[in-house]
């Protein structure tokens, strides 16, 4: 029920708002799109997918930079820890580490020989355990000079032997549970 009065009021409001309206066809202010008589101007605008791809690339780059920074920090911390552990293990005295490694090799030889006797069928599961079992059985069956040579070879690399023997012991415990 638009009376002529309502139409007049609506036209006046539209005329007042035209000054702030941009035509979507020619991109000029002052008239509505349906009133436009000009041609459509070309305005280069990136597509929505291109904008989304740019945003994703920026996020990935930020994450990569953050992860690279974090890994560099972690590497520095690990290097510091390694250098501290190496210096502390080397300063602890090489004689005590050699005697500890020889006693560890003798105890591991006796335990691994028991394992090899009881579980010969499972010895093929890990080459390191089978080689240690073979060397331990040969050292236990042969004279003490061979075990002395084993301990001297293990004492030559004291830091690596102490780390490897500590790593081997939990594996042997797992085998006993099976």
UniProtKB/Swiss-Prot annotation:
Region (Disordered) residue spans: 66-178
Keyword Metal-binding set for record: yes
Keyword Metal-binding annotated: yes
Any one Pfam family match given in the protein's UniProt record, by short name: zf-CCHC_3
Signal sequence segment: none
Zn finger intervals (CCHC-type): 21-38
Domain of life of the organism encoding this protein: Eukaryota
Skewed-composition ranges (Low complexity): 85-113, 121-164
Keywords noted in UniProt: Metal-binding, Zinc, Zinc-finger
Alphabetized GO MF terms: nucleic acid binding; zinc ion binding
InterPro entries according to UniProt: ZCCHC10, Znf_CCHC_sf
Protein name: Zinc finger CCHC domain-containing protein 10
Organism: Mus musculus
Gene: Zcchc10
């Amino acid at each position: 029920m638009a009376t002529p009065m309502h139409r007049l009021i609506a036209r006046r409001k539209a005329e007042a708002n035209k000054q702030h309206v941009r035509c979507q066809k020619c991109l000029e202010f002052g008239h509505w799109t349906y009133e436009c008589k000009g041609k459509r101007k070309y305005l280069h605008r990136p597509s929505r997918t291109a904008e989304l791809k740019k945003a994703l690339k920026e996020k990935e780059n930020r994450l990569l930079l953050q992860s690279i920074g974090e890994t560099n920090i972690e590497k520095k911390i690990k290097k510091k820890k390694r250098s501290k552990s190496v210096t502390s293990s080397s300063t602890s005295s090489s004689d005590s580490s050699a005697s500890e490694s020889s006693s560890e090799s003798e105890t591991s030889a006796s335990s691994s020989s028991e394992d090899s006797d009881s579980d010969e069928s499972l010895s093929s599961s890990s080459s390191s355990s089978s080689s240690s079992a073979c060397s331990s059985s040969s050292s236990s069956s042969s004279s003490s000079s061979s075990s002395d040579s084993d301990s001297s070879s293990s004492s030559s690399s004291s830091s690596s032997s102490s780390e490897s023997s500590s790593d081997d012991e939990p594996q042997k415990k797992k085998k006993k549970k099976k």
